[in-house]
Curated annotation (Swiss-Prot):
Residues 9-24 have a biased composition (Acidic residues). This is Uncharacterized protein YebC. GO terms for cellular component: plasma membrane. It is a multi-pass membrane protein. The keyword Protein transport does not apply. Residues 1-55 are annotated as: Disordered. The gene is yebC. It comes from Bacillus subtilis (strain 168). Its main location: membrane.
Length: 267
C-alpha cells in the first residue's frame, strides 16, 4: 500500500509540474500582451495631447490675429476719422460692434471706480454699496442698449425724414467706426477715474458725451448729403436723433441714475 501511495503521490507532483510548466508561458504571454496594450494606449494618448495643445495654440493665434486686425482698423480711423469714415465711406460692421462693446466695457469699469469713490464725497452720490459685477454689468448692458437705440434712431430718421434707405447694419458699422476716437478719449477718462481725480473726470465725461452726439450728427450729415431730395432740413434731422436719445435717457433715468450719477457728478 505504501508503494502505491508513493506512486500516486509522485504522479500528482508530476502533473502539477506539468500544469505549472504550461501556465508559465501563458502568464508570460499575458504580461507581454498587457505591456503592449499599455504602450498602445500611451501612443494613442500622445496624439490626443498634441492635438489638444495644437488647438489651444491655434485658438490663441486666431485671437491674436483678430486683435491685430482690429488695431489696424482702429489706427487707420484715428489718423483722420471724419475723412476716413464720412468722406471715404470706410467702415466695418463687425469692428463697429466691437468698438461699441469696448467703449461700454471701459466706461463701465471707470464708472464702478467712481461709484466706489463716491462714498467719501460731500454730496454722497452713489452711497449705496454695489458689488463689482452689479455696478459693472448694469452700466454695460445699459450702454449697449443705448447704442442700439441710437442705431434705430439714425435708421428711422434716415428712412422717414430723409427718404434715404439705410440698413441697421450700415448704421451700426458707421456709428461704431466713428466711435473709435471716443474710445481713445475714454481710455484717458478711465485712468483719471481709477486714480480718482474729480476735476479731470468731469471734463473728460463731458467731452465723451459731446463726442458721442457729435459723431451722431456727423453721420446724419453724411446720410443727408447722400439723399438727393430730402424733404426736411438737416438740422431738424439731427434734432430728431438727439431727441430720441434724450427721451430714452429720461425714461430710463430712474433705473440707472444711482449707478452713473457718481461719474456724471463726482462731488
Amino acid at each position: 500500500m505504501t508503494e502505491e501511495r508513493k506512486e500516486t503521490f509522485e504522479e500528482e507532483i508530476n502533473q502539477s509540474e506539468r500544469i505549472d510548466a504550461d501556465e508559465e508561458p501563458l502568464s508570460r504571454m499575458s504580461r507581454k500582451a498587457s505591456r503592449q496594450s499599455k504602450q498602445k494606449q500611451k501612443q494613442k494618448q500622445k496624439p490626443r495631447q498634441e492635438r489638444g495643445e495644437s488647438t489651444v495654440k491655434d485658438k490663441l493665434a486666431s485671437v491674436w490675429a483678430a486683435i491685430n486686425r482690429y488695431c489696424g482698423f482702429a489706427f487707420s480711423i484715428l489718423k483722420s476719422p471724419a475723412k476716413t469714415v464720412v468722406t471715404d465711406g470706410f467702415s466695418h460692421y463687425k469692428y463697429g460692434l466691437i468698438s461699441m462693446l469696448i467703449f461700454s466695457i471701459i466706461f463701465s469699469i471707470g464708472n464702478w471706480f467712481q461709484l466706489k469713490a463716491s462714498w467719501n464725497r460731500p454730496l454722497g452720490f452713489g452711497e449705496r454699496h454695489h458689488a463689482f459685477y452689479d455696478g459693472f454689468l448694469v452700466v454695460l448692458v445699459y450702454l449697449l442698449i443705448f447704442f442700439a437705440v441710437m442705431v434705430f434712431a439714425i435708421w428711422a430718421v434716415s428712412r422717414y425724414m430723409m427718404k434715404q434707405k439705410v440698413t441697421f447694419r450700415e448704421a451700426a458699422a458707421v456709428l461704431g467706426s466713428l466711435l473709435v476716437p471716443v474710445i481713445a478719449v475714454s481710455i484717458l477718462w478711465l485712468i483719471f477715474a481709477i486714480v480718482n481725480i474729480p476735476m479731470l473726470t468731469v471734463l473728460f465725461t463731458v467731452l465723451i458725451l459731446f463726442s458721442i452726439f457729435f459723431i451722431i450728427a456727423l453721420y446724419v450729415q453724411r446720410v443727408y448729403q447722400a439723399a438727393q431730395d430730402a424733404p426736411i432740413d438737416y438740422i431738424y434731422c439731427v434734432f430728431a436723433v438727439v431727441a430720441i436719445a434724450l427721451l430714452f435717457t429720461a425714461v430710463t433715468w430712474p433705473f440707472i441714475s444711482e449707478y452713473i450719477t457718481a461719474s456724471l457728478i463726482p462731488l
